[in-house]
Every structure is written in C-alpha cells, then in structure tokens.
Regions:
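Short capping segments at the starts of secondary-structure elements
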Residues: 19-27
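Alpha-helical DNA-recognition elements
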Residues: 53
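Short acidic, hydrophobic short linear motifs in intrinsically disordered regions
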Residues: 26-35
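Amphipathic alpha-helical dimerization/coiled-coil segments
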Residues: 82-130
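Short, cationic-aromatic polyanion-contact patches
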Residues: 10, 65-85
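Short alpha-helical segments that sit at the start of domains
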Residues: 1-19, 78, 82
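Glycine-centered, phosphate/nucleic-acid-interacting loop/turn motifs that mediate DNA/RNA or nucleotide
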Residues: 58
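Short beta-strand "wing" residues that participate in macromolecule-binding interfaces
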Residues: 62
Length: 133
C-alpha cells in the first residue's frame, strides 16, 4: 500500500523507474538483474514488494503475462514529469523558491564543461527573450 502523502519516488523506486524508462516492459527478474548490475543486489521479495508499492502510487503498471507466469511492468509516469516535480520541490524546500539560488548552488557542486555552459547560455538567452515578450 502507498504511504500517505508520498508524492515522490524513493531512491529505490527512482532506480526502478530509470530501468523502466530505459527499456520496458520488464519482468521482476529483469528489474532485479538491472538493479544488481547497478550495485543494488536485492532479494526477489524486496523487488516484488517495491513494485507493488509503486503500482499503488500509480508510478508503474503491472501487465498480464504474455507467456508463462511472469508479470511485466511499465512506467506510468514520464521522466520529465518526475524530474520536474522533484526539482520544483527541491527549489521550493531548499532554496526558498529561488531558481537563481538553485542554479548558483548547482554551479558550486558540479563542474561544467564548455559544451554544457554553451547549452545553458542558449537556454538562458531563450528564456530572457521569452521574458521580454
């Protein structure tokens, strides 16, 4: 059952969503193997329980088996939607709603190469133009 008030995926749920966003549908065994390759060697029952919780939250959908008895899972939420909500929450809670402070904080913890800086400059130029219109 989903925890009340739990709008964002937990760390493990986010890892599973990333696996499903990369390639879906996936079975429990396939998800467990992908988690193990990423350094999370979990019991089969732990993965099943987590998938049930995620289905209850509406993050994933359990599909009926095609062949055999293995259920398959697909994401019900898009990566862009999850990242937008999580970033918005972070900006609100940590940076008091200031996007500028969040970007400054990002620059302090992440080194950017020239290509990333150029792309960010293009984005800022576009946003500046939109704000003036």
């Amino acid at each position: 059952m989903a925890r009340p008030g739990s709008h964002f995926p937990t760390e493990l749920e986010l890892e599973i969503l990333k696996i499903l966003w990369a390639s879906a549908p996936r079975t429990v065994s396939e998800i467990r193997e992908a988690l193990a390759l990423a350094g999370r060697d979990l019991a089969h029952t732990t993965v099943i329980t987590t998938l049930g919780t995620m289905a209850g939250k509406g993050q994933i959908e359990k599909l009926e088996p095609e062949v055999g008895k293995a259920f398959r899972f697909v994401p019900r939420v898009a990566h862009a939607e999850v990242s937008r909500h999580m970033l918005g929450d972070l900006v609100h809670r940590v940076f008091a709603g200031s996007a500028e402070a969040a970007v400054q904080g990002l620059f302090e913890v992440k080194d950017l190469d020239a290509t990333e800086i150029a792309r960010l400059r293009q984005l800022l130029n576009r946003k500046t133009k939109e704000a003036r219109e």
